[in-house]
Amino acid sequence: MSKILIIGAGVMGSAFTFPCIDNGHKVTVLGSPLENDRIDELSKTFFHKILNCNVSKEINFLKSDQLRQQLKAKPDLIVVGVNSKGINWISKELNNELFL
């Protein structure tokens, strides 16, 4: 079982959780700073309004302020699934955490 960190709780990041969970991996979805409300909702209901479907209750949903802690946990795979509004944010954050 691999630890997979998916950054972005939108359509792309959330859809990627399905094959990961189906293959027995431990999945954490970390929202961008723009997705705090979505993370709160997913954590409570496990229903993704945009995808119009339930997501696995095995997924750990976290807000963006938990990024550093998640990177220190050394995930086996990091998937960046943010849209164009979030790419600058995550690029800077990953650069600061992984390469400095």
Model-based region annotation:
Residues 1-54, 59-62, 66-69:
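NAD(P)+-binding Rossmann beta1-loop-alpha1 motif at the extreme N-terminus of oxidoreductases
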